[in-house]
C-alpha cells in the first residue's frame, strides 16, 4: 500500500495479473486497470467445454428415476463459435421417442427456440425475436418452467443475461399441469447435438450446465 493511502504507511502497491493485496485508493485501482495490471476475474473460457461440430462433440446424461415433469429450471452459459456450421445446433435435447421430446436449440436464423412435443402434439414453441450472433459474447440462458401456473405465459419463462425475454415471433405455451418430456426415467439428456446423433451439432463453448427439478 502506498504511504499516502489514508495515512497508512506500507509497501508500494504492486498488483500482478492474479493478486492485488493491500488497501487501495479508487484512483490507484483505476490506474492499474488502465495499465492492464489489475487482476481479472476468471473467464468461463478456461473452465468451459469446447464443442466442435466438425468433431461431432456432445455430452449425455442418463436419467435414473422420474422426478418433477411440471416444474424445473434449466440454465447454461453459451458462447457460439461457428454460425454457419450445423443446421439448428442443439443445446439440450431430452428425447423419449419421435413423439415425445424436449428441445433447446438455435434456429438457422440464430433465434433461440424452446420446443416441446408430447404424445405427438406440440405443447411448447417459443422462438425469440432476439438473435444470437455475437461470437465474442457469453450468453447466460435460464429457462424456468412451471406448468402448474394459471397464466399460460407464466408456465415458461426465458431469461438471457439476467433479463426476461418477452418478445417472441412464435409463442405456444403448454396447458396447465402438463407433464413434459423431461426428468423421465431411462431417458438420456443429450447436450450439444440432437438425440439421433446424425446432425445438429453445436459449435462453441458451454459452461455451468444445470438442470434442477421442482
PLM features: residue spans?
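Interface-prone segments of viral and bacterial extracellular assemblies
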Residues: 1, 23, 30-32, 206-211
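Short, intrinsically disordered N-terminal pre-domain segments
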Residues: 1-19, 110
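Extracellular glycan-associated modules
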Residues: 4-6, 38-214
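Compositionally biased, intrinsically disordered low-complexity segments
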Residues: 11-15, 22, 26, 37, ...
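Serine/threonine-rich, low-complexity intrinsically disordered segments
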Residues: 18-20, 130-131
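Noncatalytic linker/hinge segments flanking ATPase motor cores
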Residues: 20, 26-30, 151
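Extracellular glycan-recognition surfaces and repeat-rich motifs
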Residues: 25, 31-42
Amino acid at each position: 500500500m502506498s504511504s499516502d493511502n489514508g495515512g497508512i504507511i506500507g509497501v508500494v502497491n504492486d498488483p500482478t495479473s492474479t493478486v492485488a493485496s493491500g488497501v487501495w485508493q479508487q484512483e490507484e485501482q483505476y490506474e492499474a486497470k488502465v495499465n492492464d495490471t489489475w487482476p481479472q476475474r476468471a473467464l468461463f473460457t478456461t473452465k468451459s467445454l469446447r464443442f466442435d461440430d466438425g468433431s461431432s462433440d456432445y455430452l449425455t446424461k442418463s436419467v435414473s428415476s422420474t422426478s418433477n415433469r411440471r416444474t424445473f429450471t434449466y440454465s447454461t452459459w453459451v458462447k457460439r463459435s461457428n454460425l454457419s456450421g450445423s443446421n439448428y445446433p442443439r443445446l439440450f435435447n431430452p428425447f423419449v421417442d419421435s413423439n415425445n421430446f424436449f428441445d433447446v436449440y438455435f434456429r438457422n436464423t440464430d433465434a433461440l427456440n424452446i420446443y416441446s412435443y408430447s404424445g405427438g402434439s406440440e405443447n411448447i414453441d417459443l422462438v425469440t425475436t432476439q438473435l444470437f450472433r455475437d461470437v465474442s459474447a457469453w450468453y447466460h440462458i435460464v429457462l424456468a418452467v412451471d406448468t402448474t401456473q394459471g397464466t399460460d405465459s407464466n408456465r415458461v419463462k426465458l431469461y438471457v443475461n439476467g433479463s426476461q425475454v418477452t418478445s417472441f415471433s412464435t409463442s405456444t405455451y403448454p396447458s396447465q399441469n402438463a407433464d413434459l418430456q423431461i426428468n423421465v426415467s431411462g431417458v438420456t439428456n443429450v447436450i450439444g447435438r440432437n438425440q439421433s446423433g446424425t446432425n445438429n451439432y453445436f459449435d462453441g463453448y458451454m459452461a455451468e450446465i444445470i438442470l434442477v427439478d421442482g
